[in-house]
Amino acid sequence: MSKEDVIEVEGKVLEPLPNAMFLVELSNGHKVLAHVSGKIRMNFIRILPGDRVTVELSPYDLSRGRIVYRFK
């Protein structure tokens, strides 16, 4: 899957789950399961409930995503 195929949406972190997973509510009301991208993990960026984040979704599975940015 190339980088052009992903869908980027904004959302809000609802709750942290085990294994660095998060339940994220998207701006359109859908809830997705998202994990943290490698760059966020390498830079030790903390993600807490209530944070606004950008999530990349695959067009093949819209119920799972990757958190790629946390807004300040």
Swiss-Prot record:
It comes from the Bacteria. Keywords: Cytoplasm, Initiation factor, Protein biosynthesis, RNA-binding, rRNA-binding. InterPro entries: NA-bd_OB-fold, RNA-binding_domain_S1_IF1, S1_domain, TIF_IF1. Signal peptide: none annotated. It is found in: Cytoplasm. It holds the Pfam family eIF-1a. GO terms for cellular component: cytosol. Residues 1-72 form the S1-like domain. GO terms for molecular function: ribosome binding; rRNA binding; translation initiation factor activity. Component of the 30S ribosomal translation pre-initiation complex which assembles on the 30S ribosome in the order IF-2 and IF-3, IF-1 and N-formylmethionyl-tRNA(fMet); mRNA recruitment can occur at any time during PIC assembly. One of the essential components for the initiation of protein synthesis. Stabilizes the binding of IF-2 and IF-3 on the 30S subunit to which N-formylmethionyl-tRNA(fMet) subsequently binds. Helps modulate mRNA selection, yielding the 30S pre-initiation complex (PIC). Upon addition of the 50S ribosomal subunit IF-1, IF-2 and IF-3 are released leaving the mature 70S translation initiation complex. Belongs to the IF-1 family. This is Translation initiation factor IF-1. It comes from Desulfitobacterium hafniense (strain Y51).
